[in-house]
Amino acid sequence: MPLAAAVAASAVVPPRPPPPPPRRARPLRSFTGLILTRDLAALTVARCAPSPPAPAAEAEAEAVAVDEAPPAKPRPRRYPRQYPGEAVGVAEEMRFVAMRLRNPKRTTLKMDDTGAEEEVGDGVSEDASASEEEEEEEDDDDVVEEEEEGAGLEGEWMPSMEGFVKYLVDSKLVFDTVERIVAESTDVAYVYFRKSGLERSARITKDLEWFGGQGIAVPEPSTAGSTYATYLTELAESNAPAFLSHYYNIYFAHTTGGVAIGNKISKKILEGRELEFYKWDSDVELLLKDTREKLNELSKHWSRKDRNLCLKEAAKCFQHLGRIVRLIIL
């Protein structure tokens, strides 16, 4: 009986289920990181999102405004003005200065190589010509007398033996100074012009000895010659291009206007005697051409400022030479 009761009781009570597995809790930091990551992603997406397209009407208005705007004009390119004779060399530029001094009232000249007309005043820069304008006007007559073919000697000049000897004395001082500087200077620029064949100092000495043998007194150099010689000496030490401008123009003036003056003086007061001052051992035109070519080649290495200074000094050279020539009639 008791056994039967126990069996019945066991059949009525169900068995207990097994306990559930234990739950594992995730750390709080993982949950926080997940939230932060989601927030940053949302911010990034919001910041990089493309802006909404503009309305079609606004886009068309902008396109029409762009089409109606005038095109920008290109800025004009400025080229420096070329001086008359600049393509040939500084000696050619100085020739235009001489022509301007010889013909102060003329406004245009014809270029020999191109046939194009150029203003004579263009041969000197504004800086070079402005400071010399008044002096050039005062000494135009002097420059004309010395520069070309002795124009105006007939009927205007009354040369004297005493005045001509003074002219030779001052000329000798100028040529002595120039030739001494070129021969003794250590400046490389002057070396090219040594023994050019144009030298005049020794020949003038022979002429002055002849005048002394004729009983004619040979005076000391005048103020005009001494002033110019001093100026040349100082200039040679400070600026080679400026000095070479005087060097070339002194010989240029003598081989052109100087020879013409000598011929007329010889006929008037020397009974046709030809002086040594006007003689050369070879063709003087070739000698002057060789000197001119050397100067042009050397001037290729000069700045425009140096060339303008040469043009300014060329005008001064003709002024000084004009004062010396006037000694003939004083």
From Swiss-Prot:
Cell compartment(s), UniProt: Plastid, Chloroplast
SUPFAM superfamilies: Heme oxygenase-like (SSF48613)
Keyword Chloroplast tagged: yes
UniProt feature, compositional bias: Low complexity: 1-13, 56-69
GO molecular function: heme oxygenase (decyclizing) activity
Keywords attached to this entry: Chloroplast, Photosynthesis, Plastid, Transit peptide
Top-rank lineage group of the source organism: Eukaryota
InterPro entries: Haem_Oase, Haem_Oase-like, Haem_Oase-like_multi-hlx, Haem_Oase_decyc_pln
UniProt cross-references to PANTHER family, sorted A to Z: HEME OXYGENASE 1, CHLOROPLASTIC-RELATED (PTHR35703), INACTIVE HEME OXYGENASE 2, CHLOROPLASTIC-RELATED (PTHR35703:SF1)
Listed name of the protein: Probable inactive heme oxygenase 2, chloroplastic
GN (gene name): HO2
